[in-house]
């Protein structure tokens, strides 16, 4: 029994379930001399095959359990498969029995069938990956053919028309408000003119009453003048009668001339009295006329000053009313503009709040996807760690298996003439060193599509076989 050559092809580092296991870089140990090769342990990418006439059952059992733990159930694209392989054989049948070579051949056949099954499942996974990739390409191509740009133009035109209509409605409302304010202003002006007309009519009525009083006073004075004239005429008549009576009395007497002072002329005296009365009456008439004219002038001055003051006040009131009206019109226009701007602000806030809500939903969705990606990355890292530990354990068991095989080669030597077991105590330890380069690949997958792929080269590792 010669196990002088050991060749293995294995992935340098297990990969997460999203990639196919048992593929990647390979390492090969050719440190054992070529002259000692009789049986072989060979492998292809994704497989391990062992040929040996006899293997201890404990080693085979340990190797099968390690291989089963290193190849867990994996899933991809909705299909899953799980496999486990068990090796069992009696130690006496493998080491000391006559059918050790057949048992090892059976073991190799079962392992080959298992690896063939793994390869078929990997091929099935590749087909499913291709179908999924084609489906995503078709879906992506279908979505790209839809062009909504013309709808965006129509929406923009409709939004512009709505905005123009709103502005036109605001202008019409502003014109209506201005017309209402102008009508109210004209109504206020009419009411003010009405009040002014009533005030002027009242003033005219007052002046008419004063004129009537003045007319009555003038009539009274004229009546007094007429009375004075009548009294004067009566006095003149009485004087004439008295003069006639005196003259008649003097006509029947004897004319006696007395040397004395001349008597006063009565006619002249009466004439003087009449002139005095006439002057007094004329003076009273002039005084009455002067008083009347003075009172009329004062009254006219008071009326003119009052009318002027009233007119000035009314003019100021009208100017103030016009100013108030202009300010009210400007206030209404500003209020209408404020309402229109508030409406536009509310529409803008509502539109941008909806946009912000959509963006927040998108952010939450992306955060959820990112958390899922992180969880998936952590899960893949854990699976990677488990597979790497299984790989390390498998390599250790393979190294132990090789040492045991080489030890069994020295212990058990059979003679062609004497089919007995010869025990020979030899111990050979071969510890080749294999340097592997480790490369970590991180893929970011969103909706089944690879978004980004990063490779991180690691430090070289030394494996003692």
Swiss-Prot record:
Annotated region (Linker 1), positions in chain: 136-154
Span list, region Linker 12: 247-269
Annotated spans, Head: 1-98
Function, in words: Type 1 keratin. May maintain oral mucosal cell homeostasis and tissue organization in response to mechanical stress.
Organism per entry: Protopterus aethiopicus
InterPro entries in the record: IF_conserved, IF_rod_dom, Keratin_I
UniProt keywords, alphabetically: Coiled coil, Intermediate filament, Keratin
Spans annotated as Coil 1B: 155-246
Entry's family note: Belongs to the intermediate filament family.
Polar residues bias locations: 1-28
Name of the protein in its database record: Keratin, type I cytoskeletal 13
Region feature Disordered, mapped onto this chain: 1-47
Name of encoding gene: KRT13
More about this protein: There are two types of cytoskeletal and microfibrillar keratin: I (acidic; 40-55 kDa) and II (neutral to basic; 56-70 kDa).
Region (Tail) residue spans: 409-465
Superkingdom field: Eukaryota
Tissue specificity comment: Expressed in skin.
Sequence segments annotated as region (Coil 2): 270-408
SUPFAM superfamilies per record: Intermediate filament protein, coiled coil region (SSF64593)
GO-annotated cellular components: intermediate filament
Region (Coil 1A): 99-135
